Swiss-Prot record:
Protein name: Nicotinate-nucleotide--dimethylbenzimidazole phosphoribosyltransferase
Pfam families given in the database record: DBI_PRT
Cited SUPFAM superfamilies: Nicotinate mononucleotide:5,6-dimethylbenzimidazole phosphoribosyltransferase (CobT)
Lineage per the UniProt record: Bacteria, Pseudomonadati, Pseudomonadota, Gammaproteobacteria, Alteromonadales
Active-site residues per Swiss-Prot or TrEMBL entry: E317
E.C. designation(s): 2.4.2.21
Signal peptide: none
One GO BP annotation of this record: cobalamin biosynthetic process
Top-level taxonomic group: Bacteria
InterPro entries, sorted: Nict_dMeBzImd_PRibTrfase, Nict_dMeBzImd_PRibTrfase_bact, Nict_dMeBzImd_PRibTrfase_N, Nict_dMeBzImd_PRibTrfase_sf
Function: Catalyzes the synthesis of alpha-ribazole-5'-phosphate from nicotinate mononucleotide (NAMN) and 5,6-dimethylbenzimidazole (DMB).
Catalytic activity annotation: 5,6-dimethylbenzimidazole + nicotinate beta-D-ribonucleotide = alpha-ribazole 5'-phosphate + nicotinate + H(+)
UniProt entry tagged with the keyword Transferase: yes
Species this chain originates from: Shewanella oneidensis (strain ATCC 700550 / JCM 31522 / CIP 106686 / LMG 19005 / NCIMB 14063 / MR-1)
Amino acid sequence: MSQSSLSFQIEPVSKAQDQVIQQKIDLKTKPPGALGMLESLALQIARIQGPQQLQIVKPTMLVFAGDHGIAAEGVSIAPSEVTHQMVQNFAEGGAAINVFCRQLGLTLEVIDCGILTPVEGVEGIIDQRLGAGTGAIHLEPAMSLDCVDKGFAMARELIERHHQAGCNLVAFGEMGIGNTSSAAAIMAAIMQLEVADCVGRGTGINSETLARKLTLVELALLSHQSAMTGPKQVLACLGGFEIVQMTGAMLAAAERKMLVVVDGFIATAAALVAVTINANVRDYLIFAHRSEEQGHQRMLEHLQAKPLLSLGLRLGEGTGAALALPLIQAAANFYNQMASFSDAGIEAVV
């Protein structure tokens, strides 16, 4: 695998047209700032796409699935088999994310990044398997560095296919029993925080299970401390196959100047790694919502992110990212279609 396939050339967005963009927003038939966060969202999209017509084309939801060795220790209310069952549910159209994607006209793709046993006999699952579940991170590395590189390369090919098809917005969701443990460990390692500030109740575990989860994540961080010399090494030691591929896909999408809609705690952990690898990724990220997982707010603050929604969600699957899509479309539509004061013959209030 060539090194060129693993590096990402991501341009920072240009702020040269900010005055033009902001004036266009301010001269719409409304008081300045009256559309709140939709105005800052329109500015962000216009920085990426240019100050003329904004476009949301072929928006696509990517749900990355993988299993985690640590799940065998009972860190979730559900066993690892549920990952397989939910991936099958996605393929058959029965999950919350399927319902929301149908309602909103979002294309949905489900990627098997490495669940314990693949779903067979069902169409609609993309095979990008890196293994049959990761290593148990409190006992061994999750995967090798070569595996991280392979995951990034697969993710780049996935994004390239969508880019070539004309898609300019990708939303990120995930499924993997045990992945809040992995995400919390990644957060603690990169942000240099106490584990207790990062580990939460995930699927709704009780206090006894939470204490066990906390101990195992602390053990994982201690075990791999000397090996975690950079963000890719953090992924190799602590990550999930789905977190690795989300990270690579976010890097690839930013490289192609696509809008990247980030879902909840696990997707934000992938975004944290992506931004640590290349800070320019941050310009392309739209954070959909603040989840109930306790570490999520800290990660959002670290990334200087203001999420669009706060609905008390803790499901994952990309559900929050899907629900944010109409707001992103509304930001583009008001920018494109709303009359200016001069167009409407109204006295300006700027």
